[in-house]
Amino acid sequence: MIKVQLSDADRKEVVKYRLEKANRTYQEAVGSIKNGYVETAANRLYYAADYAVSALLISYKYEVSTHNGVIQMFGKVFLRNNIIDKKYGKIFNQLFSLRLTGDY
């Protein structure tokens, strides 16, 4: 875990960028599904969630540099403390598994 040393203004910009990227990536997933590219859709859905969770972590002054780190910190900070319902952790883990299956 790394505590982010950003100014409040910079942190807001990074969070905004990650959320915009999450939205664009989600739209890519929707387009992939419409065109029958299920594996690509799984990849894009995972990354949309990853960008959104990363934005959430950064907004709380946490930053991690790996996919597993994002998943673990999300669980540690938000799920174990019942800030976010655990069902969203399960969905995030399922998306990660689907991405791995589709990519490899």
Task: Give a label for each model feature.
Residues 1-104:
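Terminal alpha-helical segments
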